[in-house]
C-alpha cells in the first residue's frame, strides 16, 4: 500500500481517506505479526554510562545540549517471593529516565553520549519482597492470590512512586533541598552541563520526583500540597502547562469526596508563589482521568472527557488502579469544558460541551479577536487535540496486546470492531467566549468542530515549536500509525493551514517514539529546526536517536546504540550551559 515502505511521503488532503482506509486494511491483514517490537517493551536494561553512541550523518552543532526521555523500562521483576512478577499495563512499567548528551567538538563532529537510570528501585524492592505490587497503578491486573485484607492495608502504607511520564525543567516554587542541590553540580562527559535549575519527572499523581540532571539519580519528591495547602487532592495532569514568555507553570488538582473539587492554579516563575485561579466543586462537574489540558494567552481550559471515575472518584481507593475505577464509555456522556481566567482573577468564566470522546494529549490552544456582524469585538478560542472516538485505546496498551502474546492483539482489537477506534484524529474546536462571565455548570453552550485530520496524517504524542504554546501556530509533529504494528510506526509533520503532511517511515520493525522539535536559534520560520525521535530497531534489538530536518522530515543523522532502549513516553531538549 502507498505508505507501507520506508521513506518520506508528501501527502495532501486528497490522500486522507485512502491513507486512513489503508490503516484498516493493514490491521485486518494482521500486519503487526511481521513487525517485531518486543525490544521496545521487555527486558530493558539500565546503562548508567555515559556510553558514546555511533554517529552516522550529522547533527547540527547548534542542537548541543541534552535530550532527556522518560517512560516505562523494566516490566518484570525476577526472583520475587512469588516467582516472576509481570507488569500487565505499559503505563505501569517501572520508570526509567534517559539522557542523550549532544556535544559539538572542536573538529566539527558532534558527539552523542548516552546514560540511563531506573527511577523506581524502591518499588521494585517492595515487589521483590512481597511478590506483588501494592499501591496505586494505572491498570495493573489484580493478583488473585492476594486477599482483600492485604489490598486494603496497602492503602495505609507509604506511597511508592513510579514517576515515568513527562519531564519538567526549571519548575518554580518547589522547595529547595540543600542535600540534593549539591548533586546538580556534577557534569557529564567532556564537562558537558545543561542550562536548568532543576529537573523533575511527573505522572498523573500530584507528586513529582526531582532527579539530578547529570546523574539522573532520583531525589526528593514534591507534591502540589507543598506548593499550596489547598492542593491536597491525589490527582492531576502529567503535562503541566508553561507560559512560554513568563515561564509561569499551570496545572490543576483534583480532590475526591461527596462533591469532587477541581482547583486550577498558577505558580509564578518570578516569585515562586502559587495562586489558585479557580475552585470548582459541583456535582455536575465529574471527576475524570485527564492526562493534559489547554493554555491560551488569557485562559486555562480543562476538558473533562468521557473517562469519568465511578463513586465520585472514591472507587480508585477500592480498585487500586485507574482503569478499573473508570465508568464504561457512554456516548451520551459529553465532554465538559471549563474556561478559567488566568489574568484578572475572574475565576471560571465559561463552560461548554462537545460530543463524547477521549484524549490523552492536547496539542495547543490559542485565541483570536474578531469583529462580528455588528462590529462588536469578540474572542474565539481554538483547541487542538488528538481525539479518540471512545476509550478502547486505553486497554490497547496492555503488554499482552502490544507484544501480541497468545494472539492477544487480534482478540482485543477485532472484538466488536475495536480496531476502528485505535487511531486518533487531530481535531480542532472553536468556542466563542461570552462577553460577560457565564460559569453555567449545565454546560448548555457548545463548541464547533472546525478541523479534523485523520491518522496517519496526524498522530499521537504531539509536539510543537515550544515558543508557540498558547499562541496561533501552523505545524505539529507527532508519532502516527499505519496499522503495521501494535504501536506507532511513523513520524508526521502536519500543516494545519493546508492539511498537508510529511510522513517519515523507517524499515520494518523500526518503531519511533515521540518527536521532539528543537528550533534553530534565531530562526524566524516556525518549522526551521530539527526533530529528534528515539527509534527502536526491533529486528536487531537496538536503538538510535534519529535527527530529521524540521521542514522536510528528511534524515540528517542518527546516533546508534548497540542495545535496545525503551520506547518511552515523553522527552525534552535542554540547551547546554
Curated annotation (Swiss-Prot):
GO molecular function: carotenoid dioxygenase activity; metal ion binding
Any single Pfam family the record assigns to this protein: RPE65
Compartment annotation: Cytoplasm, Cytosol
InterPro entries: Carotenoid_Oase (IPR004294)
Entry's cofactor comment: Binds 1 Fe(2+) ion per subunit.
Enzyme class: oxidoreductase
Induction data: The expression is subject to photoinduction and is transcriptionally co-regulated with the genes of the other carotenoid biosynthetic enzymes.
Pathway annotation: Carotenoid biosynthesis
Family: Belongs to the carotenoid oxygenase family.
Stated role: Torulene dioxygenase; part of the pathway that mediates the biosynthesis of neurosporaxanthin, a carboxylic apocarotenoid acting as an essential protective pigments and leading to orange pigmentation. CarT mediates the cleavage of torulene into beta-apo-4'-carotenal, the aldehyde corresponding to the acidic neurosporaxanthin. Is also active on other monocyclic synthetic substrates such as beta-apo-8'-carotenal and beta-apo-10'-carotenal to produce beta-apo-14'-carotenal and retinal(beta-apo-15'-carotenal), respectively.
Protein name (Swiss-Prot/TrEMBL): Torulene dioxygenase
